[in-house]
């Protein structure tokens, strides 16, 4: 993979700049070291073809052929997560790393169907992740929210059953959003209209988002907006194929949760510079920069910020706008948004006073 480096001053600015992460899969933060630790702890035998060491894992993760190749490894890794403490440890490791990168608000995905089909109760999953959210909030002064994703390669009926089984967590405000992930092209948004309608009708305060326009074309984005009634699009890089869609995203202030290093790792593009990030900026399409599955793609949120800066050379003024758009597009309350906005202003002022 290409190297992305920037000046020490700019890296410090980007590190301190308060960030919101809207697109990270907790199962995708499973570092090889924790994967092997949990496999041993839970007496899990990994497939014979799976890498045997941390080094071999990292090497294999550097050679994903496409989205499906990654997903095959992703689901194997998921298999070592068994107990509530496993899910807690996984999430706390992520929150600790994200905080060190200057991430103050996270809205994190998890895939309950991938665990339930392994006979792991959804309560084990949610309670482990929720406990980590609470502990991270207390320890780091951050805010963290859970978004339950449906796996689009599974039948929509299964997704609806999963929503019903998670209803109490939506009711209690423990799960804050609904998302849609996994293989995109064979499973378009129209398959999941009933799932999204159920959430919208029964829990209107819950945020709706969906992966769209990563491998699928711009019509996947339009369909997610029109049919699923989402207020956010995950990835959405192919939105640039339609000027009409771009104008709509800008006018409606629909946030795209971009994942630059993920797009390179999964062969969507060869280099971050090929992404239409500058076009999104020029056309006032709001976006945030995110890590997606950092344990598999070799970069957490700061790494993605650095990669974008290296390739597009955004000024501190432009980075301030990106940070503010991320805050405004978050599903936290106005008080928290105002706190984060003030912190962005403080960091921006600090680095401008330094005169660089």
From Swiss-Prot:
Its EC number is 3.5.4.2. CDD domains: ADA (cd01320). InterPro entries: A/AMP_deam_AS, A_deaminase_dom, ADE, Ado/ade_deaminase, Metal_Hydrolase. GO terms for cellular component: cytoplasm; nucleus. Binds 1 zinc ion per subunit. It catalyses: adenine + H2O + H(+) = hypoxanthine + NH4(+). Its cofactor is Zn(2+). GO terms for biological process: adenine catabolic process; hypoxanthine salvage; nucleotide metabolic process; purine ribonucleoside monophosphate biosynthetic process. The keyword ATP-binding does not apply. The active site is at 214 (proton donor). The record marks 235 as: Important for catalytic activity. The keyword Zinc applies. Substrate binds at residue 293. Signal peptide: none annotated. It is found in: Cytoplasm; Nucleus. GO terms for molecular function: adenine deaminase activity; zinc ion binding. Belongs to the metallo-dependent hydrolases superfamily. Adenosine and AMP deaminases family. Adenine deaminase type 2 subfamily. Catalyzes the hydrolytic deamination of adenine to hypoxanthine. Plays an important role in the purine salvage pathway and in nitrogen catabolism. This is Adenine deaminase. The gene is AAH1.
């Amino acid at each position: 993979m290409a190297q992305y480096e920037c000046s020490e001053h700019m890296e410090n600015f980007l590190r301190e700049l308060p960030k919101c992460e809207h697109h990270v899969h907790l199962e995708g933060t499973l570092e090889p070291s924790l994967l092997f630790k949990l496999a041993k702890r839970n007496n899990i035998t990994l497939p014979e073809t799976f890498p045997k060491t941390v080094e071999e894992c990292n090497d294999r993760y550097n050679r994903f052929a496409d989205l499906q190749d990654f997903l095959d490894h992703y689901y194997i890794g998921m298999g070592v997560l068994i107990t509530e403490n496993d899910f807690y440890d996984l999430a706390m490791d992520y929150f600790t790393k994200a905080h060190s990168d200057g991430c103050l608000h996270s809205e994190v995905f998890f895939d309950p169907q991938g665990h339930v089909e392994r006979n792991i109760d959804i309560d084990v999953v949610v309670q482990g992740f929720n406990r980590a959210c609470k502990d991270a909030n207390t320890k780091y002064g951050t805010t963290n929210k859970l978004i339950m994703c449906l796996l689009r390669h599974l039948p929509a009926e299964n997704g609806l059953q999963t929503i019903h089984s998670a209803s109490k967590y939506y009711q209690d405000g423990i799960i804050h959003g609904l998302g849609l992930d996994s293989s995109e092209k064979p499973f378009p948004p129209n398959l999941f209209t009933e799932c999204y309608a159920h959430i919208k009708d029964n829990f209107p305060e819950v945020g709706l988002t969906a992966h769209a326009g990563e491998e699928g074309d711009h019509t996947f984005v339009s369909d997610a907006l029109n049919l699923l009634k989402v207020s956010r699009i995950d990835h959405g890089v192919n939105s640039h194929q339609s000027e009409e869609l771009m104008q709509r995203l800008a006018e409606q202030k629909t946030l795209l949760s971009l994942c630059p290093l993920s797009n390179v790792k999964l062969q969507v593009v060869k280099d971050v510079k090929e992404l239409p990030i500058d076009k999104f900026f020029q056309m006032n399409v709001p976006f945030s920069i995110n890590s997606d599955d950092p344990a598999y793609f070799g970069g957490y949120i700061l790494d993605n910020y650095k990669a974008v800066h290296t390739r597009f050379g955004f000024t501190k003024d432009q980075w301030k706008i990106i940070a503010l758009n991320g805050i405004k597009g978050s599903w936290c309350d106005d008080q928290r948004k105002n706190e984060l906005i003030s912190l962005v202003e403080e960091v921006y002022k600090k680095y401008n006073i330094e005169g660089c």
